[in-house]
């Protein structure tokens, strides 16, 4: 043997001995086992790749070398892809006639261990669901010939490929495909590839015959030396050779085409995108039609760049994995997943009737029968999820869809978490914060962890909302909502179902381990009418009828619940003030449809001051003013002008004043008559100082943000008007239900009074000057620290008068404004005016002074800092984000010093 080649000249005269040695050596090197056949096939199909479930056959049959005493070796130079560990090797009737040595090696059904890198093949395949892992190592024999040297060289090639496809990586191209290892699809592929025509086979044989044959010499024979094993470098090169990279077909489990035996992976081109039917934070949902089947689906499209930027890849993969493992009639189905350069696509079951929130808004609230049925369907879906150890963690009406038969489908598993199976009450818990503020469980706010018990809490909130049409926990902002949740502060409407109320009380337990399990909820009295839970998905849902929502009103002792700040209820000046807890509700059926109850609600508080005016009016509120200390009273009714920082610069087209802010100067007794549709007694006597009402709305040219020290001149009505009003008050006191006609007359007359009274105001008092001096540093944090409680309370009460237009954005009875001023906030190329407010809580937020809505809040923590860039420009940094503000008066240094001082006292 020279340079790894077998020389024919070495074995001319010793054929018998060499063949015997070869047989003995071969038997020693090969470990023979049962149930495997390796056959060397003389057919040289160079361009055919077979997927064979059972055998990889290479047959050497009846190779008779009569003239040159050599074995004519034929090789399969194919990239054969095979799946099982069964190989056949038949060396039949290899006759060497010249030397009369017949060596028959019939190794049928033998498995050969490749300990010496012989002609072996090993493959392993494992896979389940959407994850497939496979390894393949193969060695093939190749023949090279040289006409010049007359030598035959046998070499061995090895290939090894390992691949793993899983849904855990966002950057894998096939990550959003559901993989199927179905043997049926593989058999179909094999049958398709093996269905070659005879002419094609003959063409392959003809090509084989046309190839140059190796030279044979009478002196040549095969050496008994073992063929050389490939070196490590050769193995490494062969391992990365393209023809050895074996890949199984990857396709969705739903991706098999009905008219094709080859699995097809779906892509965007397979669907027609019709229209957008929903939008979310990271993408949108479109109605799509599959071109081949004309089936309708909903495609959830997620933007890749946005997901990576927001670090939400983990949640997207979790949603895909969880949806792929679920199969329940009350859970939306996932059919295909794929991606392109920019987006990820979830092809989901289409629910044509929208979500539960839309149905709830149309109906107002649901009847008990509808609530019971849909609550049962939601419970079935939760039971299925919790049985698999999955917590949804974002249960709300927006994530519950209505199918074509009005049955519920739970969707949106982006916040879902895979926990241990049977984790209720003692299993694993997740510490990540997710969900919606109004439905979040208290343990996630306090303990920073939650399990499947979080779904039970959200289920209780959802049940409350379906019955009443309102949320149980709803504050002015998320912070206030969280306080309501942690204190479990909510109330029920008057006509709330008692049985359902008992169930909700158990569901909304602050202790997560005291909340009932799914089975305990099923056995509750509220679901006693359901005998067969398994028949719920096949039942016809009860019809949804429009109803009047049972609005829950804030409890009187609530200091955190959002209270509507309007002229009808006023704003508290001190802790002794008692105010109406129930804002008026519009009646359903009134004779006069032209009544504007918004204006009626916002313009019915009348205060007192003395001035004569010849006007007539009728009102629903009278004020009795103490005239002297002897206790005698003089019944008069007055309007007073608001004590505002600046007056409005324009009025509406009909000269109707929109803002009247009475300034209380004396102790009064106010009698308020509630409308007929209120549940409280018709006559409620409130003995207190009337509060200054809060502006309910404003226009672009209103009194907000204007500076003026002038006040409106007070005016009063004639004595005859006062007597008429007193007579009307006595009439209203004697009846409990004012008629619609009375309400209409009151509204119309009241509007006339406002027009006449406002026309008497001196127009010179209106100012069109520039916005108020900014910033208005009202109080420094260091000064506030040294104050006692009484002093703080007095400041708070005074601010509710001086800064009343901004007090609606404060936490009730808790916050003191440290600074308040008009600024310009710049975001990119856009600059908008914003009222910047800093409080002692501490809180920093900014308000749109025109729309009177809070536009944003800056987190106050240890990362807070402020920088002065110029006399007007300053930056507030928090949580890695910078917000640019511009002080119009060039006093940016005051803002910076105040913010840094506040941060130092709070967190240093």
UniProtKB/Swiss-Prot annotation:
Binding annotation for ATP: 281-283, 300, 349-351, 355, 398, 412
Bias (Low complexity): 53-170, 179-189, 200-216, 607-684, 710-741
Principal EC category: transferase
Residues annotated as the enzyme's active site: 394 (proton acceptor)
GO biological process terms on file: chemotaxis to cAMP; intracellular signal transduction; positive regulation of phosphatidylinositol 3-kinase/protein kinase B signal transduction; sorocarp development
One of the Pfam families matching this protein, by short name: Pkinase
Cysteine-cysteine disulfides: none
GO MF: 3-phosphoinositide-dependent protein kinase activity; ATP binding; protein kinase activator activity; protein kinase activity; protein serine kinase activity; protein serine/threonine kinase activity
Limits of the PH domain: 764-902
EC number of the protein: 2.7.11.1
Kinase recorded as keyword: yes
Keyword Transferase on entry: yes
Residues spanning the signal sequence: none
Family membership noted in the UniProt record: Belongs to the protein kinase superfamily. AGC Ser/Thr protein kinase family. PDPK1 subfamily.
Name of the protein this chain belongs to: 3-phosphoinositide-dependent protein kinase B
């Amino acid at each position: 043997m020279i340079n790894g080649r077998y020389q024919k000249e070495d074995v001319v005269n010793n054929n018998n001995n060499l063949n015997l040695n070869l047989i003995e050596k071969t038997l020693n090197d090969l470990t023979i086992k049962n149930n495997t056949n390796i056959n060397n096939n003389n057919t040289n199909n160079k361009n055919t790749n077979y997927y064979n479930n059972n055998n990889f056959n290479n047959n050497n049959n009846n190779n008779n070398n009569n003239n040159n005493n050599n074995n004519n070796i034929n090789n399969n130079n194919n990239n054969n892809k095979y799946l099982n560990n069964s190989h056949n090797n038949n060396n039949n009737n290899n006759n060497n006639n010249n030397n009369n040595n017949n060596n028959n090696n019939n190794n049928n059904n033998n498995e050969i261990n490749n300990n010496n890198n012989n002609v072996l093949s090993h493959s392993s395949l494992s896979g389940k669901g959407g994850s497939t892992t496979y390894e393949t190592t193969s060695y093939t024999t190749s023949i090279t010939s040289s006409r010049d040297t007359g030598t035959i060289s046998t070499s061995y090639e090895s290939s090894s490929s390992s691949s793993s496809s899983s849904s855990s990586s966002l950057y894998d191209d096939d990550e959003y495909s559901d993989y199927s290892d179905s043997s049926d699809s593989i058999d179909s592929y094999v049958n398709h590839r093996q269905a070659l025509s005879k002419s094609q086979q003959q063409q392959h044989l003809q090509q084989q015959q046309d190839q140059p044959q190796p030279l044979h010499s009478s002196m040549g024979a095969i050496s008994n030396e073992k063929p050389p094993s490939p070196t490590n470098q050769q193995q490494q090169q062969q391992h990365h050779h393209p023809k050895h990279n074996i890949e199984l077909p990857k396709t969705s489990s739903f991706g098999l085409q009905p008219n094709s035996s080859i699995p097809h992976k779906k892509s965007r081109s397979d669907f027609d995108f019709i229209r957008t039917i929903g939008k979310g934070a990271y993408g949108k949902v479109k109605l799509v039609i599959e071109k081949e089947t004309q089936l309708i689906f909903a495609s959830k499209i997620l933007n890749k760049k946005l997901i990576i930027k927001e670090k939400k890849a983990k949640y997207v993969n979790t949603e895909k994995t969880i949806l792929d493992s679920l199969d329940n009639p009350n859970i939306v189905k996932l059919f295909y997943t794929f991606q392109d350069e920019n987006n990820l696509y979830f092809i989901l079951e289409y629910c044509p009737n929208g979500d539960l929130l839309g149905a709830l808004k149309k109906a107002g609230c649901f009847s008990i029968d509808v609530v019971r049925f849909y609550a049962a369907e939601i419970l079935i879906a939760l039971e299925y999820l919790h049985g698999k150890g999955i917590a949804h963690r974002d249960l709300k009406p927006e994530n519950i869809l209505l199918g074509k038969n009005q049955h519920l489908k739970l969707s949106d598993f982006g916040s879902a978490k895979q926990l241990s199976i049977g984790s209720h009450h003692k299993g694993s818990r997740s510490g990540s914060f997710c969900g919606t503020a109004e439905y979040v469980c208290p343990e996630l706010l306090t303990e920073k962890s939650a399990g499947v018990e979080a779904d039970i809490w959200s289920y209780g909130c959802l049940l409350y909302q379906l019955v009443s049409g309102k949320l149980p926990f709803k504050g002015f902002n998320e912070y206030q909502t969280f306080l309501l949740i942690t204190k479990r502060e909510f109330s029920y409407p008057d006509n709330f179902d008692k049985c359902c109320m008992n169930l909700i009380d158990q569901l909304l337990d602050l202790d997560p381990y005291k909340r009932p399990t799914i089975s305990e909820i099923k056995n509750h009295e509220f679901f006693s009418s359901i005998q067969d839970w398994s028949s719920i998905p096949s039942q016809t849902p009860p019809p949804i009828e429009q109803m009047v929502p049972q609005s829950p009103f804030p409890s009187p002792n609530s200091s955190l619940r959002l209270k509507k700040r309007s002229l009808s209820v006023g704003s508290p000046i001190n802790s002794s003030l008692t105010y109406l807890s129930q804002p008026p509700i519009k009646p359903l059926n009134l004779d006069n449809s032209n009544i504007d109850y918004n204006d009626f609600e916002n313009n019915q508080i009348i205060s007192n001051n003395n001035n004569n005016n010849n006007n007539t009016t009728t009102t629903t509120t009278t004020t009795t003013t103490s005239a002297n200390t002897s206790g005698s009273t003089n019944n008069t009714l007055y309007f007073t002008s608001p004590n505002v920082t600046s007056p409005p610069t324009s009025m509406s087209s009909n000269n109707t004043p929109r803002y009247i802010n009475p300034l209380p100067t004396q102790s009064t007794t106010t009698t308020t008559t509630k409308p007929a549709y209120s549940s409280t007694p018709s006559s409620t006597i409130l003995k207190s100082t009337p509060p200054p009402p809060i502006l309910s709305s404003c226009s672009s040219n209103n009194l907000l943000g204007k500076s003026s020290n002038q006040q409106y001149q007070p005016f009063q009505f004639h004595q005859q008007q006062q007597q008429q009003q007193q007579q009307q008050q006595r009439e209203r006191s004697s009846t409990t239900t004012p008629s619609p006609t009375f309400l209409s007359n009151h509204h119309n007359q009241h509007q006339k009074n406002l027009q006449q009274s406002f026309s008497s105001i001196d127009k010179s008092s209106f100012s069109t000057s520039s916005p108020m001096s900014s910033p208005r540093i009202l109080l420094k944090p260091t000064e506030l620290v040294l104050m006692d409680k009484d002093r703080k309370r007095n400041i708070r009460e005074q601010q509710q008068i001086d800064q009343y237009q901004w007090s609606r954005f404060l936490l009730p009875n808790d916050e003191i404004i440290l600074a308040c001023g008009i600024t310009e906030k710049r975001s990119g190329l856009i600059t908008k005016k914003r009222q910047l407010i800093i409080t002692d809580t501490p809180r920093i937020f900014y308000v749109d002074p025109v729309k009177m809505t809070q536009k944003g809040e800056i987190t106050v923590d240890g990362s807070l800092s402020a920088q002065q860039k110029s006399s007007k420009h300053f930056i507030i940094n928090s949580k890695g984000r910078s917000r640019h503000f511009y002080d119009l008066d060039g006093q940016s240094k005051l803002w910076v010093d105040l913010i840094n001082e506040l941060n130092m006292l709070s967190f240093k």
